[in-house]
Structure formats: C-alpha cells, structure tokens
Amino acid sequence: IAQCLVGSEMCIRDRNTEYYDLGLEHRNETDDQVTIDAAEATKKYGVAVKCATITPNAARMEEYDLKKMYKSPNGTIRAILDGTVFRAPIVVKGIEPCVKNWVKPITLARHAYGDIYKNTEFYIDKPGDAYLVFEGEDGEERKELIQHFDGAGVLRGMHNLDDSVKSFARSCFNYALDTKQDVWFGSKDTISKTYDGRFKEIFQQLSLIHI
C-alpha cells in the first residue's frame, strides 16, 4: 500500500515520517499527552494520517485499568487544529447512488471546535439551583439561572468562539468555491437564538464577502 501511495518503491517509513501511538494503553501511560503531541505535529507539518482510536467509557476504564476517562482523541486533535470536518462522498462510475437522480455529490461540513467535544458536565445527586456564570476580566459578572433541580439530574456546559466560527465559515466557503458546490447552512436558531444564532450571523456576514 505504501508503495502504491508514494508511486515508487520507496517506503513511506523512509520519508522522515513521525509516528505517534494513540492506542488507549499508550494514551493512559502518557496521561494523553501523546494525543496533544500528535496534534501539534500535524499543525507543524500540515498533514497527517490517523487510524481509528477508542474513546473510553465506563467499561473500557475497567478493561484497560485507566487512570481516568480520557476524552475523544478526535475531539482533542480537532480542538488544537481548529479545523473543519468535511465528509465528501467518493463518486465512482458504475456505482449508483441510493437516490438515483442525485448526480452531484453532497458534502457535509461540521465545525470541529468546542460544543460537545469540549463540554463540561457532571451528575447532580441532590436538589438545588444550576447557574450559568461569566466573570469578565474587568470584574463584570453575568449570572443566569439554568434550572432548579428538585432531585437528581445531569448538567452540561458548552461554548464556542467567534474566531473559530469565522474560520469554520471561511473553510466552508473556500471549499465550496474550490469544488464548485453551493453552501446550505443549517442551524436551530429558532430555538437556540443566541448560540446557534451567532453561527448564523457570522455565516451571513462572511457570505457577503464571498459573493
């Protein structure tokens, strides 16, 4: 396979390739530092090939005797790269699509920073109030009640950054221009008026630049 990819008898291993073991056991040995190192190397060289990895759950923690329940390595790498995940179909003559009148590929683009991959969450085992709190560096504090808990439940906090969303939007528009595809934006801004609404605002602003 290596020879076919390179197009010669020279093996990929001879091309100063760096390898990072993202197996669960090695991630546990390094406290997941190896995942960070792999992401930084990807930023340095501008290219990487990644094999499938395991994101541990409670059963995996016991099976591998892990120090903690490590986060998704994909999520860690994407957060460091601040990239966009493009899922494009492989179009091959002779293979008919499920929807036969689709003659052009549909590419899905997903923002790869923040949201659930960098969320903070915990289990609540007693009644009480949950708040969303922001403390500005200038001393200003904003505090909003999320929910009054009458009993046990779960809580999650997520975030995103304007700069990252702008980078995501630019990636989408540039990809669309390169591949001559239209851009269709989807969000739940009718419900998430601030969070998803901010995505919509940024895409709208940058779309005017690319028109």
Please name every model-derived segment.
Residues 26-137, 141:
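N-terminal glycine-rich phosphate/adenylate-binding segment common to multiple enzyme folds
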Residues 1, 27-28, 191-195:
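A generic structural signal for short coil/turn motifs at secondary-structure boundaries
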Residues 137-170:
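An N-terminal, well-structured beta->alpha segment
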Residues 22, 53, 188-190:
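Short, ordered loop/turn segments at secondary-structure junctions
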Residues 1-7, 209-210:
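Single conserved hydrophobic/aromatic residue that forms the stacking wall/gate
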Residues 159-208:
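Active-site pocket-lining segments that scaffold enzyme catalytic pockets across diverse folds
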Residues 10-11:
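Active-site loops and adjacent core secondary-structure elements that bind or stabilize anionic groups
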Residues 15-21:
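N- or domain-start disorder-to-order transition segments that initiate the globular core
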